[in-house]
């Protein structure tokens, strides 16, 4: 009876933004939140890094450090981690590397890189706190918060499932972990068709496969 309706086309982020703007109050998010642009994120992280009391990575320029930290922050969100769970995973990885990598130069390089990533978590925590203080979200926040909303609010899940009776996912090979978590929470036993080609995957760094 709904065949005369036009299909709704959304990116994952625009879909997540809609969920957060319409239902964010359920988890304490102001519906009038502002989005932090890439330039704004870069400026904010630059301020944090410049004020950081220790040298975060002596092998990189300050601009390079900022870029690496923002990239790691995005990876953490896209994989569905928090800073704390990321810290636990990196610490465990580091302990395992220490056991197997003694005397191995290649392993030492990986150990050093892992230590730098652990050091980056402090600025990421500061960045997240500054965003909360400013009342802004970045693109990764949209997906994390939307997933939390649909997980914690059954009425929101029911309303969205009723609105989207059938779901078509394009370029499915580029779906990240957090995007998949959002989709499976909402539409895990729903009418879903996914189209993708694993040979064209370009977002493996964020968990897509």
Region annotations inferred by a language model:
Residues 24, 54, 78-81, 155, ...:
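Generic structural signal for secondary-structure transition and capping sites
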Residues 24-25, 103, 193-197:
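Short acidic (Asp/Glu) and glycine-rich catalytic loops that position anionic groups and cofactors
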Residues 1-72:
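Conserved P-loop NTPase-based nucleic-acid remodeling module centered on helicase motor cores
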Residues 30, 55-59, 83, 134-137, ...:
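Short, polar/charged, Gly/Pro-enriched helix-capping and turn/loop motifs at alpha-helix termini
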Residues 41-131:
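Coupling/switch/interface segments within P-loop NTPase motor domains and analogous charged loops
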Residues 8, 33-41, 45, 73, ...:
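Conserved helicase NTPase motor core
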């Amino acid at each position: 009876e709904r065949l005369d309706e036009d299909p709704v086309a959304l990116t994952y982020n625009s879909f997540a933004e809609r969920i957060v703007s319409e239902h964010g109050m359920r988890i304490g998010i102001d519906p009038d939140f502002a989005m932090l642009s890439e330039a704004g994120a870069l400026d904010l992280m630059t301020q944090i890094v410049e004020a950081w009391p220790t040298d975060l990575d002596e092998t990189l320029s300050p601009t390079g450090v900022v870029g690496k930290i923002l990239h790691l922050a995005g990876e953490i969100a896209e994989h569905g981690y928090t800073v704390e769970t990321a810290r636990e995973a990196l610490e465990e990885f580091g302990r395992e590397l220490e056991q197997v990598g003694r005397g191995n130069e290649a392993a030492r390089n990986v150990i050093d890189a892992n230590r730098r990533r652990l050091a980056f978590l402090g600025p990421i925590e500061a960045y997240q706190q500054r965003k909360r203080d400013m009342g802004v979200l970045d693109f990764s926040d949209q997906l994390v918060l939307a997933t939390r909303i649909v997980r914690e609010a059954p009425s929101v899940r029911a309303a969205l499932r009723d609105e989207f009776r059938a779901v078509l996912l394009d370029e499915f090979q580029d779906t990240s972990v957090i995007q998949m978590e959002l989709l499976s929470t909402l539409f895990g036993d729903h009418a879903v068709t996914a189209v993708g080609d694993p040979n064209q995957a370009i977002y493996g760094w964020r968990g897509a496969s």
